[in-house]
Regions:
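A glycine- and charged-residue-rich anion-binding loop/surface
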Residues: 17-31, 37, 41-42, 49, ...
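Cysteine-rich micro-motifs
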Residues: 56-70
Length: 971
């Protein structure tokens, strides 16, 4: 890391910085009064040294599993479970919902957000319920959908993959029961004391868990740029929930500042509630009853319940994150407690572990893909590919894929849908889902040969050993999954590998870009490009600020007006351009400037002018009246391209499937592009189908409605498809609706009717990264230009080939076939010429020959080495040359090869000037050639000097040198 680069702290490091201060001041940071009200007292855990609150002095440790040493509820249950009442996964959610909806301060239940966090520029997936409301609800810029609210939010976390199937409590995808409260200065709801009270009432009244069984640990929470004290509550050695009180905004270096909005964020693992109540061996039995039953039935797998029963209470100790490199010793210790050897224990639970792992990973994948993410090698989506390939590897190892096949795997996904529906709602029909899984399976079976070569090269470099960072490199860059690496290298997968990968991604997130202009004190610029979309001239607007351009040596060429009809670069749409006029000094006539760029900073619109403002006093310009105009032709074309982007997006989703989401877009005057999520490249037929569908929408002449809607109402009515183009951080959204086709929250400029666009043409498409395609297209006037260019090509070919347009394809095929036939004849003749020439040379008495040729270089490389043995035995040398190349085999020991090389390469100074030239000299000299003898499979090495050179050759100097050294010109 260079000195200029800021150090980016992880959430763990930020928490560590804050903990000492929080511990010293419990009354300041923690709700001590409500603890005392419920009869809890503060104590310090002798095992971990953390402070906690207990209801009975008989409780000596904090309640964390690592301190208790086992899950004490297994086989016993607690609360209503201990009284014989079984609690289901769905039932646990209902108890929570009932308790908080009927609390003293009633909570509103909201629907879950998609697990793909398209409203967040800094994360890819929702890892906690609060992610749905960061940063804008937390900062107060936007109102939450309800306040206070509760939800069951599906989350993805990939830092615990090492623990899944073992500890009983870890998942890659899970439902987090959430309580979120947003206390603004002008509207207080409730904070720490009430939060603890409501949670304890749910535990004791609905679940009937005794207070003596509950412990509350003081902790620190950090995430999503926020920080605050938190209270974790435990029952029977299991953490059930965490009450976070957000009080601070954190910076990447660990410093913090108070938040204006005080936020409560409660996160409870829904999967843990039925487990602790029922006292099951593992939570997976309570969460995946249908999936486990189906998988066992299809694969005939057998769980060793005897060993699992012995192991389950102690499984809490195997959290890799907390084991700190002592995983092997912990396994030894648990095995001893179970009266087993470590090998017997590992083997005894291995089938169960793999069943749980497959059920967990497939459920996480189901929700992620249903919500619009695709497995890939890029960014966070590489985690999806990782867990999918991990699933394939486990199933292959066990022989399960052979038994259940792809049909069986789809049945497993269906079980998850059935189990999740009561909480998350019904899943929509998703025709392309199976195709996505099948393609990933084929890719896994045929692991990229290049990836294996890279691994082999790395392994040789590291002398057969891979450090943790090497494993991460192979997974994140080479596209290999851990099981493949282990299989190919014979190395053991590091115990905490998945945690390290997650940590790697967290550290890879760059800090936000620096804000060059502090403009929060200014009133928001009144934006008129939407309400007056067809207004291109203005006058009477006033300057409110003049700025020096920080990127152009403080050049005074930026103005901010009180109103603006100029559209700033935003949402992928390029800015308007135009002209403005104003008096630069009092008493002077207005001066005209070109507006060359328009940007939005906070709530202000910055106009960048083509030259510096010649004013004596910049402050005197405040209040100066400005007139101007927007480039109408550019605005119109950008408007066409922006609306066409919406149409292409909707058309791609209709043709390819519901997994298609916009991943980015750019609309310029010349052309537009849209990036979409898709698992394979587009065929010509698919491109045409999307283009045809887009033009069908145009021909229908659909109305494009543009209107404002309250954010809560818009999300409730349309869902998160609104945010195809990204989040709009406003309480009121501008909705752009193409009737019956597409609906998005969008602030860009758009046509009033699809018919205004006239025509859309797709130029081409390409894969820009794994799982993401880029489609280039043009609309309106640019589409007509593109069509005319195609027509010109057809006309030119028709004229040159003297055939009607309909016969161009057949004529081209005929020409190409003739060309291939002639090329083959030329190749055959070239080979014959070379062989005849060399055979003739072999019969000559002279030893050294040079031969000027106009044949292609590749013919010499392919054919001359066949004569290497004969040339060596007869001590003959032969060099072929032309203006573009030199190739030869040399046996002459008296020839000064270094001098020949110097002549070919030339003066180093000249060579330096040629560095960027396409004809720069390249010279290669080897002391052997590889030849494949007739009838043999393997090549053999023949010791003979081989020289080759490419580039603009100095043939006269080379020829002169060789002739002076006894070479004879052979014609």
């Amino acid at each position: 890391m260079t000195e200029e680069e800021p150090k980016v702290l992880t959430t763990r490091e930020i928490k560590k910085l804050a903990r000492p201060e929080f511990e010293k001041n419990p009354e300041k940071f923690y709700p001590t009064k409500v603890f005392q009200k419920w009869g809890f007292t503060r104590a310090r855990c002798p095992k971990c040294d953390h402070y906690f609150w207990r209801h009975s002095e008989k409780v000596e440790v904090c309640g964390d599993s690592s301190c208790v040493g086992l899950y004490t509820f297994i086989g016993k249950g607690c609360g209503i479970g201990r009284k014989g009442q079984k609690l289901s996964y769905e039932g646990a959610w209902k108890t929570f919902k009932k308790s908080f909806e009927n609390a003293k301060i009633p909570h509103t239940t909201i629907k879950r957000y998609p697990v793909v966090a398209r409203w967040r520029p800094d994360v890819e997936y929702v890892a906690a319920g609060i992610y749905n409301f960061q940063p804008y609800c937390v900062t107060g810029e936007m109102d939450p959908p309800a306040n206070p609210l509760i939800d069951a939010q599906f989350c993805l976390r990939f830092n615990d993959l090492d623990n899944i199937g073992i500890t009983g409590r870890h998942y890659s995808g899970f439902n987090m029961l959430g309580v979120q409260v947003f206390n603004k200065p002008q509207k207080y709801i409730y904070f720490k004391e009430e939060c603890v009270d409501f949670n304890l009432r749910w535990l004791t009244e609905e679940l009937e868990i005794g207070l003596d069984e509950i412990t509350l640990i003081e902790d620190v929470w950090a995430g999503g740029g926020n920080l605050g004290p938190s209270i974790e509550y435990f029952v029977g050695g299991l953490e059930l929930g965490n009450m976070v009180f957000m009080q601070y905004k954190t910076h990447h270096n660990g410093t913090r500042e108070p938040l204006q909005v005080q936020v409560i964020d409660v996160g409870i693992g829904l999967e843990r509630i039925p487990w602790v109540v029922n006292g099951s061996l593992t939570s997976y039995f309570d969460v995946f009853p249908l999936a486990i039953e189906k998988l066992i039935k299809m694969t005939k797998a057998e769980i060793n319940y005897g060993i699992l029963k012995k192991f389950a209470p102690y499984s809490c100790l195997l959290d890799v994150d907390e084991a700190e490199g002592k995983v092997s010793e912990i396994w030894d210790s648990i095995a001893k407690k179970c009266n087993l050897t470590k090998e017997e224990l590992l083997e005894g639970i291995s089938v169960a572990k793999d069943i749980f792992l497959v059920c967990d990973h497939t459920r996480a994948l189901l929700v992620a893909i249903e919500d619009g993410s695709l497995p890939s090698n890029v960014g966070g989506a590489s985690n999806l590919r990782n867990i999918l390939r991990r699933t394939f590897a486990v199933c292959a190892k066990r022989g399960w894929m052979e038994k259940m096949g792809m049909d069986g795997l789809m049945e497993l996904f269906q079980c998850h849908k059935t189990e999740l529906a009561p909480i998350m709602g019904e899943f929509k029909e998703y025709k392309s889902f199976r195709s996505i899984i099948e393609i990933e399976y084929k890719r896994w079976l045929n692991t990229d040969i290049d990836s294996k070569k890279k691994l082999d090269k790395l392994l040789k470099k590291k002398k057969g050993k891979l450090a943790p960072e090497d494993w991460i490199l192979c997974i994140t860059s080479f596209g290999l999954d851990p099981e493949q690496i282990a299989s190919l290298t014979g190395l053991k997968i590091p115990d905490n590998l998945y945690y390290m990968i997650a940590d790697h991604y967290e550290r890879s997130v760059p800090p936000p870009p620096e804000n060059l202009y502090q403009l929060a004190h200014l009133k928001p610029t009144i934006e008129l490009w939407n309400t007056l979309e067809n207004k291109f001239q203005f006058e009477g607007f006033k300057i409110v600020q003049v700025l020096e351009n920080k990127k152009e040596n403080d050049k005074l060429n930026i103005i901010i007006l009180d109103k603006s009809i100029f559209y700033p670069t935003s949402g992928g749409q390029m800015n308007d351009t135009g002209k403005v006029s104003f008096a630069c000094n009092k008493g002077e006539k207005p001066m005209e400037f070109d507006v060359i760029d328009v940007q939005k900073n906070a709530k202000s619109i910055l106009l960048f002018l083509d030259h510096e403002i010649p004013t004596k006093d910049p402050k005197s310009l405040i209040g100066t009246q400005v007139s101007g105009s927007v480039n109408e032709k550019r605005r119109k074309q950008l408007k066409m391209h922006h609306t066409a982007t919406h149409i292409i997006s909707a058309s791609a989703k209709k043709i390819l499937g519901p997994h298609v989401w916009q991943h980015g877009a750019k609309k310029t005057e010349k052309r537009a592009r849209i990036d979409i999520t898709h698992y394979s490249t587009l065929s010509f037929e698919e491109e045409r189908a999307i283009e045809n569908e887009a033009n069908r929408v145009i021909q229908l002449g659909l109305k494009v409605n543009k209107y404002d809607l309250e954010k809560q109402e818009a999300e409730k009515k349309y869902g998160f498809i609104l945010y195809q183009g990204g989040i709009v951080p406003e309480n009121t959204l501008r909705i752009v609706e193409i009737e019956g086709t597409d609906i998005e929250a969008c602030c860009g400029t758009h046509v009033d009717n699809t018919a205004d666009i006239s025509l859309i043409r797709i130029i081409n498409s390409r894969r820009i990264s794994d799982g993401v395609l880029r489609i280039y297209f043009v609309a309106y006037a640019r589409a007509l230009d593109f069509t005319n260019q195609e027509s010109d090509i057809v006309h030119d070919l028709s004229t040159q080939w003297s055939c009607p347009p309909k016969d161009i394809t057949q004529t081209g095929k005929r020409f190409f076939e003739t060309f291939k036939q002639n090329k083959k004849k030329i190749n055959d003749m070239s080979v014959s010429i070379i062989k005849l020439s060399i055979n003739s040379i072999l019969k000559q008495e002279d030893k050294n020959f040079i031969c000027r040729s106009n044949l292609e270089y590749r013919h010499f490389v392919s054919n001359v080495p066949q004569f290497a043995q004969q040339l060596k035995e007869l001590e003959k040398s032969i060099i072929f040359y032309s203006q573009e190349y030199i190739y030869g085999l040399i046996t002459n020991p008296n020839l000064d090869l270094n001098k020949l090389k110097a002549i070919i390469i030339g003066d180093p100074k000249v060579k330096k000037r040629q560095k960027n030239s396409s004809k720069k000299i390249q010279f290669v000299m080897k002391n052997k050639v590889m030849v494949k003898p007739k009838g043999k499979k393997k090549k053999v090495a023949i010791q003979i000097t081989q020289i080759s050179s490419f580039g603009d050759q100095k043939i006269h100097s080379i020829q002169k040198f060789l002739l002076e050294n006894g070479f004879i010109e052979f014609n």
